Amino acid sequence: MSSAVVVGAGVFGAATARELALRGWDVTLVEQYAPGTVRSASGGDTRLLRFAHGDVDWYAAMAREARLKWIELQEATGTHIWEPIGLAWFARSEDGFEARSRASLDRLGIANEWLQPEAARSLYPSVNVDDLAGVLYEPEAGVLHARRATQLLVEDGEQAGVIYESARVLPADDPHGDVVIWACGPWLASLFPTLVDLKVTRRDVFFFGADGSWRGTPGFCDYESAHYGHGEIAGLGVKVAPDLPGDEVDPDTLERIPLPAWERMAREYLGNRFPSLADAPVIGTRVCQYDLSADTHFIVDRHPERDSWWLIGGGSGHGFKHGPAFAEYVADCVEGKREREPFHALGPRAGDAGLRTGSYG
């Protein structure tokens, strides 16, 4: 039996450890804090699962696979982690990100619908569509309960044989395994500074109080204004997150207190897009972080000097939803069943693949 040590129990590490165990590997999963910790890029209450990624089919196809795997995990464990509420992209033009995404979804046979602005009024109790050219609607998209889903991957992995250990592991510790997978999220670049180029930036998220009419409304993304969120879920409130460039931070020492400027941005967007919520109170906040690669593609590659070590990460603010499908891809690469994609290689990155939920040009 082959052995693996997976360092990091965020969604990438937890899912990969579980996947390898299901394939018969002897797996140890090591985490310095706790699965689902707010310090990780996987920490938080909810994450959108959407298929649209511009014209990059690879991620759309993986999101489709991941959705099925999340639902299978939910059904197998009897633990609720998936909200099938759909998702709307608010399009400012007919030939932008949403149009490129629609072409990709059509190529892959993923359900989508282009709505005229007025038709989108039926999706929400209150919505301003005056600035929209249309709405790209993804009926099979939804929201994951992120922290619980991460913890569930660890728990289900343990049922499959994963040994979970609480410890801080560094490259100098030279962990023992036929394969060592470093899935360290926002810590990956600090562990391998000459190999990994990631920016770790803060992201302030706000939840606003709303009445029951907002329960179960679709998630939303606004690419041009770089905001995303969802309606009322599980008593959390209506989520609004500005997806704009944030300050670089240290995930170990960051004081997770939201900044007033970010609240102003979120509230301004909320009042403009959903007018009936203009005066809604803030009932919850989160401060998390992204681990951003230069082009927003993930990292999956061997260490150039340690052939048995793999570095995976660079979720770049769009990685969580892919969890179990990404783990299958990583496990295939580790087992030599599949070549890693060229755009996941270590080394310099150029440009922006436009895989996040906002335009920054």
Language model feature labels by segment:
Residues 2-29:
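N-terminal Rossmann-like FAD-binding beta1-loop-alpha1 element of flavoenzymes
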Residues 46-123, 226:
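Dinucleotide-binding Rossmann-like beta1-alpha1 core, especially the glycine-rich loop
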Residues 5-7, 30, 176-187, 327:
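Short hydrophobic core segments
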